[in-house]
Amino acid sequence: MSRPAHKTDTIVAVDVLVTSPGRNFVALKITTEQGLVGWGDATLNGRELAVASYLRDHVAPLLIGRDPARIEDTWQYLYRGAYWRRGPVTMTSIGAVDLALWDIKGKATGQPVYQLLGGAVRDRILTYTHASGWEIPQLLDAVDERREQGFLAVRAQSGIPGLATVYGVSSGEAGYEPADRGAAPAVEVWDTDSYLRHAPRVLAAVREHVGPELKLLHDAHHRLTPGQAARLGRALEEVDLYWLEDVTPAENQEVLRHIRHHTTVPLAIGEVFNTVWECQTLITEQLIDFVRTCVTHAGGISHLRRIAALAEVWQVRLGPHGPSDVSPVALAASLHVGLATPNFAIQEYMGYEPVVHEVFRHAWSYADGHLHPGDQPGLGVEVDEALAARFPYEPAYLPIARRRDGSMTDW
């Protein structure tokens, strides 16, 4: 005879907040009968309302009456119970619930989440930020500015001659923000040949300028063929990159075997992956050095830990996606995982506009090139709901890319 379930608390309310303090975020609030509140992040850049609807219409009704302490059972319930599972909308929704439940468990026990994950294995988490410039001198100035801010690792992106817009390069004084507000996505023109001619010169100039100590990263953003990726990797080996990111479209994983045979440059991929199964071949065949899965988009803390555990066996490290297109709740969750995970290598961090820090009050902090989640119970982030309500959702889309002949290509 099975033992009756012992329930110490009950979920009584689930609310979805969509707010746009400078850019769109989706937050999930779970409230228990004992008055505990847990926060999760459900932001999916350019598709925020799809996740908000999935949560409100298909997930929230299922959570009422459940025991918030049963985190893994709830994860399995939402994942296996959705026959049409996987995909960014489903996994981001599950991730938001998972984060909120870990937040509640931390508050219920008076512990920061990283303590519930086994405790800290490091004192702080190395982070990298972004630097860009249309010309090499501008890029070098931007890299110097990041170094003055204490960063020990920088992703460098530059303009390309003949192209009016380039992924990762700011168009003005403000930081880079790819999502444009409006009724339709912006169209950018892309030329791979120009990029392949220009990128090695740019990154070599950055390395010569900064010397050997700075960790230097670069993102090709899924735009290359296998042959082009291998060629670029070979050209960048003397630059000593920390990693070369997303060289080919993520759907075509088999091509990483070809690329791996032709270059020793460290490879990173995974920000668009949603489950451990998408990472499995790349990890177990050691076709990558870093997996970049995001805690929000990959089913939350519970599932990111599964990815980390598989990766650790095969000596693959984590470097999760975490720019400003996920909220401070997501960054906090990633930091708690990072502090407690042996093969966690580095965390992406671009910072936020000041108003975002006001809406999402957080315990995590940055100093000297590193982040720490703080020691408040739970995730250490609270949302000012009244302030969030002052920033209603504004439609925004990530750009699309076309070649010079007008045909579509990967952005």
Swiss-Prot record:
One of its GO terms (biological process) is carbohydrate catabolic process. It comes from the Bacteria. Binds 1 Mg(2+) ion per subunit. Mg(2+) binds at D219, E245, E271. Substrate binds at N45, H130, E271, R292, H321, D325, E348. Gene3D superfamilies: Enolase-like C-terminal domain (3.20.20.120), Enolase-like, N-terminal domain (3.30.390.10). Its EC number is 4.2.1.-, 4.2.1.39. The keyword Magnesium applies. SMART domains: MR_MLE. The record marks P323 as: Important for activity and substrate specificity. Pfam families: MR_MLE_C, MR_MLE_N. It catalyses: D-gluconate = 2-dehydro-3-deoxy-D-gluconate + H2O. GO terms for molecular function: gluconate dehydratase activity; magnesium ion binding. Keywords: Carbohydrate metabolism, Lyase, Magnesium, Metal-binding. Has low D-gluconate dehydratase activity (in vitro), suggesting that it has no significant role in D-gluconate degradation in vivo. Has no detectable activity with a panel of 70 other acid sugars (in vitro). NCBIfam families: ManoateDhtManD, PRK15072.1. This is D-galactonate dehydratase family member SBI_01856. It comes from Streptomyces bingchenggensis (strain BCW-1). The lineage of its organism: Bacteria, Bacillati, Actinomycetota, Actinomycetes, Kitasatosporales.
